[in-house]
Amino acid sequence: MVNESQLVEVIKQAKESDKDRKFKQSVEMIMVFKDVDVKKGFAINETVQLPKKTTKPASVCIMASGDMGIKAKNAKADMVIDENELTKLSADKKKSKKMINKYDFFLADTKLMPTVGKKLGQLLGPRGKMPTPVPFNAPIESFLERFRSSVKIRAKGSLSMSCRIGEENMGDADLAANASAVATAIEKTLPNGSKNLSLIHI
């Protein structure tokens, strides 16, 4: 288990050793694994909600039509794509890739999921961005809030992973809380938990 107080010290040292810059830097967390066989299908594909808000929330695209599409727009989703737009995108692979790479997370009306899978599944799947289904009566605002404060963590064929846990102007304790949330979530996916964790670098 990762000790949060130790993470605070690691973050302090990282900030002190870094040169002053005129722009806000993202704070990245790197985890290195050991004693796992990447050739036997070891992979991580996790979404982790950070407990402390960052100044740069994740971008969320919602695929929905009708009432849910209107609710998504009213909730100020970063992008709302209806069924007609999905069909247009599926005919333009270059435009589809650009759109998919632009957003961190995708949500979709449960009724649209089969269409999304058929039209864009081959592009969304390999990128780990298949939409999370949203039931018709679900509170869109709650879904948006959860995913905007989340990070996507992927590792395939590699003994390391990295993700953004915040920005340097955040407090050390807040950054440590986010780092701890990520570490705890990833440990649960490892065959032997923390024993498979070799290094944490921030």
Q: What role is predicted for each listed range?
A:
Residues I200-I202:
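Conserved small/polar residues in nucleotide/adenosyl-binding loops
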Residues P191, K195-S198:
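C-terminal functional extensions of proteins
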Residues E16-I70, D92:
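Translation machinery proteins
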Residues K73-D78:
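Glycine-rich phosphate-binding loops that contact phosphosugars or nucleotide phosphates
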Residues I81-L190:
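Long, charge-patterned amphipathic alpha-helical coiled-coil/hairpin "stalk" segments used as oligomerization
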Residues Q6-S17:
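Interdomain regulatory linker/hinge segments that flank or connect interaction modules
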Residues M1:
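OB-fold/S1-family RNA-binding modules
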